[in-house]
């Protein structure tokens, strides 16, 4: 139920809802950092909120969990590259 609520908040047109959804997703990631769906939603929400370092960290966790032949890996790798372009040199280390 919490994941569905977080998803609804992140899709809202209200920036405050988006922020609350991101906080809820962050709590869900802390509780279960092996849930691909939670990590994916968290990463995309962080990216949309311009928290690029958090997005990269979540996507990197996903890559560790996915099998080498998983088709989602290419999309995640592109997303990481895109987020890295937004990071300052200090953040990308």
Enumerate the language-model features and the residues they cover.
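Short coil/turn and helix-start
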Residues: 13-17, 49, 71
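Alpha-helical linker/edge segments of TPR/alpha-solenoid repeat scaffolds
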Residues: 11-19, 80-93
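Alpha-helical adaptor scaffolds
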Residues: 1-32, 41
């Amino acid at each position: 139920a919490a994941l569905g609520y977080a998803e609804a908040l992140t899709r809202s047109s209200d920036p405050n809802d988006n922020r609350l959804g991101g906080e809820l997703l962050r709590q869900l990631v802390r509780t279960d950092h092996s849930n691909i769906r939670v990590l994916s939603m968290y990463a995309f929400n962080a990216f949309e909120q311009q928290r690029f370092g958090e997005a990269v960290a979540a996507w990197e966790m996903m890559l560790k969990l996915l099998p080498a032949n998983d088709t989602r890996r290419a999309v995640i790798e592109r997303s990481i590259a895109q987020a890295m372009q937004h990071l300052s040199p200090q953040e990308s280390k």
